[in-house]
């Protein structure tokens, strides 16, 4: 009987496959320093899924003031004694830095700030639906930050440049009189204050305005379409801030005006994403 009592039960040696059991997680260290983690889980359909992840550990070193680093290494005392380093969220509230400037008449300043805050709040409610619109390319950015402000004129100023050339300037110096006119103010001469070769530099820039562009268009696709005719220096595709989709127009800048003219001739009327492109030279800034 003693031998039978010492023997293990035969049922303990039998292995049963539990369908609900998952294999243990496996972690393998690779030669390049990364780790491969293999785990298992059940998906929404109840099937067992194997998940393999490759993890790379990156160490970020931060250089701080030695005195600040020394204070961080101090041992906590009082009610915080024995707690881990760093702020404890149950006793410490971390907020943004507030600059305190003491003043003698702080009550009057507080009342004035409260009054101004109410006016600003109402103005903010009035302008919350307003959007910034560029006067040059109609994009959602300020006109001063437009990438084409030096090469194009505003969209609404159609024909302004030609009208300015035909109409004589009002009050021109020496018009109809026999008085002496300086060379830089004579007809056909460069305007005062114009930098050397500024007019010719603008003539060398060749920028095309492409309209009727699909909202699914990408800058890389437009670059590939127009680079067949010459070197493209810049591609600007106007996008909506909220949806990040194209707004229907783009600007293509070429290094050579001849290439731009050939691209304008070939791509005007070209079918792209079920739409017919309209290509023309962008108006230069006056």
Curated annotation (Swiss-Prot):
Q: Where is this region: Disordered?
A: 1-34
The organism's place on the tree of life at top rank = Eukaryota
What are the UniProt keywords, alphabetically?
A: Cytoplasm, Initiation factor, Protein biosynthesis, RNA-binding
Instruction: Cite the GO molecular-function annotations of the record.
Output: RNA binding; translation initiation factor activity
| Domain (RRM): residue spans on this chain | 206-284
Q: One GO term of the cellular component aspect?
A: eukaryotic translation initiation factor 3 complex, eIF3e
HAMAP family given in the database record = eIF3g (MF_03006)
Query: What is annotated about its quaternary structure and interactions?
Result: Component of the eukaryotic translation initiation factor 3 (eIF-3) complex.
Protein name as it appears in the record: Eukaryotic translation initiation factor 3 subunit G
- Source species: Aspergillus terreus (strain NIH 2624 / FGSC A1156)
Q: What would be the name of the gene that encodes this protein?
A: tif35
